[in-house]
């Protein structure tokens, strides 16, 4: 008697999975993140011979007013923010494929925190008719975003000399030292002067210098 054996193969769909990436960093400083991808079955891993790309197949993506994303062959995404951008840029989508060619995506979302430089005002006291000096000090708001030493300090209006009728004249040196040369008969507190500097992002910061003259 013949025996018939029926064999039916069931092929289960394999769906790869992914984990999104995030990062946080200071204004003006590049950040990196690496979304991760897993094969949906041990026998069908992610295809390491196919380099990851962004969703449209590119490896670079610029977002006007926000910054630029690039992706490395190992899947690390770098976001280089515009100097003045703060907040969350549009996230970027990374695409990979498994050994079956099945696509899987994940996002990378950086957060850029505002960096605000700080300053300390300067004062001085001295006798009538004698020039005085003071040096307001400035500090970057983050160790990665220092004061820009390639940009010389100026007064608030961009000048390096300021005369005040009946009081005297302020000048500022490249190192930020302010000198006030008083009119011979001036006594008391002249109008203070405001000094301006910028950090590496171009963010301005100001401080004042206030001399005092005793009779």
Language-model-detected regions and their locations in the chain:
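Surface-exposed or secretory-pathway low-complexity segments enriched in glycine-proline
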Residues: 3, 29-76, 80, 130-177, ...
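Short, conserved beta-strand segments of beta-strand-rich sandwich/propeller modules, principally
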Residues: 76, 89-93, 177, 190-194
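Hydrophobic beta-strand core residues of beta-sandwich domains
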Residues: 23-25, 71, 124-126, 172, ...
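Surface-exposed, short loops/turns at beta-strand junctions within beta-sandwich domains
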Residues: 83-88, 184-189
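Extracellular interdomain linkers/hinges and stalk-like, low-complexity segments
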Residues: 1-45, 91, 99-146, 192, ...
